[in-house]
Amino acid sequence: MTELWLAGANVTVTVGDLLLIVAPNGSGYDASIRRVTVVESSREADRARVFLATISTSAGSVSASKPGVYVMRSTVSPFGHNAPLQPQYSSGVFQGTFSEWALDGAELDSLLTLSSRNDKILDNSFVVIEQDDPDSGSRMWTFGTVTAVTHRSVARYGLAGNGTRLSLSTGWTKNADSKLDLLRTMTVAAQSEEIALAERPLSYPVYGETLSLEQLVEGLAPGRPLAVSGKRQAIRIRHPRPAPF
């Protein structure tokens, strides 16, 4: 998908925003994430055309009750992403070396603590976690929903501060020997807000002896006049050049 039509000319979507697209897959729902590259508003048509760039390389399953498009209002990092490396000591003496922190025991894959407090992330909202695959190192995306939100003070990895802990319907991915550098690769898109879609306009003129309407209209009968409004297609006819003698 490279473009969308949104209802209303004054849409609250701007270039650079992330959009989560949820679509049916037959037995459930799949999701993908896109970035807005262009917004073209039309006050006359009361809608906006949005062009999109692909971020997630493939769709992933998500727990949802309906299809929809959501703008992700917050893009944040997990707590500890900016922690300095852990200094190494022996018998209380600094050895002059540093190493990566082991993941704290509280770092369950069903929980994720953000690096700052966010009161606008709500239960049942969507969340997208982008991270390195701990096995291959390639980028991967996890699509889920927030099942609980807790605001708390956190002290880990030589840092202390306020954070927001999310309980997740679908956990992020780690290995038994994963370290803090895995969280450093992670970006979390949250605070989802549904946006209304508009019908895709016809890119060709209305013509012919039949006309399909978008809904059932009571009272239509043979012989009743109809009025069709819109711009008339302009056609320029070029006369052929005379044949040379």
Question: What is each of the regions a protein language model found here?
Answer:
Residues 1-245:
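Intrinsically disordered, low-complexity, polar/charged repeat-rich segments
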